[in-house]
Every structure is written in structure tokens, then in C-alpha cells.
Swiss-Prot record:
Pfam families: Ribosomal_L6
Natural source organism: Albidiferax ferrireducens (strain ATCC BAA-621 / DSM 15236 / T118) (Rhodoferax ferrireducens)
Family, as annotated: Belongs to the universal ribosomal protein uL6 family.
Protein name: Large ribosomal subunit protein uL6
Gene Ontology cellular-component annotations: cytosolic large ribosomal subunit
């Protein structure tokens, strides 16, 4: 059995988890999230915890039990604490400005780039060169951060561009004459 799939998911107070036919819903202070249940995994709830068992002895069911467990755990953490990703802008004149549900980027193009935020995602700019993306859905927060980074990825010679705050850019040496 999967090592991660063996561990139960603790459900804290203030979080409601409903396991219906083929859907798991988690509701809390941070919102509500839904996940389609996989047929290879049996989900059972007991005394403030959720446990996941493979439906059969196949490798796929074993692997999927760990995957389902972690996805539901991310949902529980998301509706209680939430997730955030930080991005930094490196470059002369590069700046970001949050305007409600929009992000306005000036990153070296001849025009400003506007990015709309999906529902459930908030964006903040504590400084003009820093972007903080927050939300309850871990996958969506990471996806939005990756889309913003793709607007101007860091280039390898000077390191200019949009990067994750914990990302290390290896700077290449220029060609010697």
C-alpha cells in the first residue's frame, strides 16, 4: 500500500467534508473545493479523519490512493490556511501593479501586459517588483503563477524577467573573443 495513502487526513474544526457518490467536497473559511472521486479508491470518513484504501490490489489503485489522499489534504489545507506563490521581477523598469482582479505588468514590451485573475485567486503587489498570488486551490495558484512567469521568463545571460522568489537562475558566461 502507498506510504502516503496509508496516512489519514485530519479534518480540523470548521471544515466540512462531504463524500458523495463520485465527488468529494470540502468547505471551510477559505471557500469550497470539489474533487471527482476515482473509482480505484475507496474513501471512508470516521471521527474527524478521512482514510483512503485502494479498491483492488493493482499498482494503479495503490498509486491512486496516495494521489487522492494528497489532493484531499491540499483541499483541506487550502480552505483553512490557503496557498500563496511569490514572484519577483528583475530588470530595469520592470514593475507590476495589482488593480482589483487584474495584474498590470510592464516588463520590457512596447505595451503593458494585463492579466485577468480567475475566480478564487487574489493578487497583491507589496512592492512594484514583487507579486503575491493567493488562493485556496493549490493547482490553480501554481497555474496562474506559471502563466505570469511565462509572460517574461528569466533569460540566462543577465537574469532579467519574472521568476519565482525561491528560484535560482544560473547565469551563463558570454562568448569570449
Amino acid at each position: 500500500m502507498s506510504r502516503i495513502g496509508k496516512m489519514p487526513v485530519a479534518v480540523p474544526a470548521g471544515v466540512d467534508v462531504l463524500v458523495k457518490d463520485d465527488q468529494i467536497s470540502v468547505k471551510g473559511a477559505g471557500g469550497s473545493l470539489f474533487l471527482t472521486q476515482n473509482a480505484l479508491v475507496k474513501v471512508s470518513s470516521d471521527a474527524g479523519a478521512l482514510s483512503f484504501q485502494p479498491a483492488n490490489d493493482s499498482r494503479e489503485a495503490n498509486a491512486m490512493s496516495g494521489t487522492m489522499r494528497q489532493l484531499v489534504n491540499n483541499m483541506v489545507v487550502g480552505v483553512t490556511k490557503g496557498f500563496e506563490k511569490k514572484l519577483n521581477l528583475v530588470g530595469v523598469g520592470y514593475k507590476a501593479q495589482a488593480q482589483g482582479a487584474k495584474l498590470n505588468l510592464t516588463v520590457g514590451y512596447s505595451h503593458p501586459v494585463n492579466k485577468d485573475m480567475p475566480a478564487g485567486i487574489t493578487v497583491a503587489t507589496p512592492t512594484p517588483t514583487e507579486i503575491v498570488i493567493k488562493g485556496a486551490d493549490r493547482q490553480r495558484v501554481g497555474q496562474v503563477a506559471a502563466e505570469i512567469r511565462a509572460i517574461r521568463p528569466p533569460e540566462p545571460y543577465k537574469g532579467k524577467g519574472i521568476r519565482y522568489s525561491d528560484e535560482k537562475i544560473t547565469i551563463k558566461e558570454t562568448k569570449k573573443k
